[in-house]
């Protein structure tokens, strides 16, 4: 215990002294492109139109009631066609995030190859379909008078953003996280979308100048049938914390675990997936690569909590992840990561140390991990 306390003090001193720049904040903003897409999904047959909902979600209800009359718009038919091809909401959100603002939306940033391939193996064909989608959405934005809608509901969207802001983590969090990983990103942005299904969300990143522009798009975090309990749907500090500490952590870990040489290393130890395969699948983690990446992100959460001086949170989430979520290899990984924390002159960033973490899986005796 004494050693752990000393290490915690060491980490706090290290990170407070090693960074001279101002604290980088977390942006919270409404994205009208994505909000408009969410409205279209509410009235599309292959979206959510045929799915009833009983929980209190005022903007979801308003979208269906106000825009039902536009269900025959071309964009709704195109959305149904794209969904049939496997190009669902998450892919369309990427398109809208990487496009200029409606009603003049056109693609500004390159889409992920995996996203394009969901439409067609022919890049020209995929590009044509995406352009048709954007042109039709531009028309919908004008015909359905979305500018008026956003003006009329400005106070609601502002209140949503303020509710998120008041639940943001420690103001030193971004600085500490970047120091721990030894890397920087251009920006970090949360995009609450009150028209989306509650608990829906996804993380995206756009290549920037010194790193990535990191985004997290998410629906309401409150699940209730009572308007008094709902507020604006985002007064949930635990969920906001998860969206920042956990999801932003992926922007540092995923680009490294996605490297071909590291994928090969990960696959070498895929026999370790067997003891926890069923419990991981219940959480949506269906393969060993995803399981390892999630282990590393959660490892970072624990260690960064120590760096922020919050050992109680570190202990709490460690217990939750190991005993309730079956991330059973965290105990081993924590022992290994100490070497990284003590030798930052040698390991300038987590990129250099992840191969060591991955190779350390070979030290694990599966007989000790019958979960």
Positions of the model-derived regions?
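Long, mid-chain structured domain cores
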Residues: 76-174
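Bacterial Sec-dependent N-terminal signal peptides
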Residues: 1-24
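Post-HEXXH active-site segment of zinc metalloproteases
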Residues: 254-281
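Auxiliary, metal-adjacent structural segments of Zn-dependent hydrolase domains
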Residues: 157-218
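Pan-zinc metallopeptidase signature
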Residues: 299-371
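Active-site recognition of the HExxH zinc-binding catalytic motif
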Residues: 238-258
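N-terminal mature-domain "stem" immediately C-terminal to a signal peptide or N-terminal signal-anchor/transmembrane
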Residues: 20-109, 325-338, 342-350
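Active-site scaffold of zinc-dependent metalloenzymes
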Residues: 117-120, 203-238
């Amino acid at each position: 215990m004494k050693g752990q306390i000393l290490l915690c003090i060491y980490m706090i001193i290290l990170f407070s002294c090693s960074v001279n720049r101002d604290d980088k904040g977390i942006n919270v903003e409404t994205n009208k492109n994505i909000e408009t897409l969410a409205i279209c999904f509410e009235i599309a047959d292959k979206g959510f139109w045929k799915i009833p909902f009983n929980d209190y979600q005022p903007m979801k209800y308003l979208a269906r009631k106000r825009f039902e009359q536009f269900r025959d718009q071309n964009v709704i038919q195109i959305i149904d066609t794209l969904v049939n091809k496997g190009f669902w909401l998450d892919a369309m959100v990427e398109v809208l995030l990487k496009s200029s603002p409606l009603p003049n939306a056109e693609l500004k940033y390159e889409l992920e190859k995996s996203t394009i391939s969901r439409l067609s193996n022919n890049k020209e064909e995929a590009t044509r379909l995406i352009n048709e989608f954007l042109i039709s959405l531009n028309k919908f934005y004008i015909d359905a008078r979305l500018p008026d809608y956003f003006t009329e509901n400005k106070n609601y969207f502002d209140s949503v953003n303020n509710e998120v802001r008041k639940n943001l983590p420690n103001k030193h969090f971004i600085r500490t996280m970047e120091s721990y990983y030894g890397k920087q990103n251009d920006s970090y942005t949360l995009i609450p979308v009150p028209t989306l299904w509650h608990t829906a969300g996804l993380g995206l990143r756009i290549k920037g100048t010194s790193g990535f522009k990191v985004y997290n798009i998410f629906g309401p975090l409150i699940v209730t049938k009572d308007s008094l309990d709902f507020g604006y749907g985002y007064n949930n500090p635990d969920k906001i914390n998860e969206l920042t500490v956990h999801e932003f952590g992926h922007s540092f870990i995923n680009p490294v675990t996605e490297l071909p040489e590291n994928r090969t290393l990960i696959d070498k130890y895929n026999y370790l997936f067997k003891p926890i395969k069923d419990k991981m699948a219940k959480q949506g983690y269906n393969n060993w690569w995803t399981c390892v990446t999630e282990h590393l992100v959660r490892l970072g959460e624990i260690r960064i909590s120590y760096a922020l001086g919050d050992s109680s949170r570190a202990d709490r989430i460690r217990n939750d992840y190991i005993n309730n979520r079956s991330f059973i290899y965290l105990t081993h990984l924590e022992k290994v990561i100490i070497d990284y924390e003590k030798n930052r002159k040698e390991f300038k960033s987590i990129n250099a140390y992840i191969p060591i973490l991955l190779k350390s899986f070979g030290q694990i005796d599966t007989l000790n991990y019958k979960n």
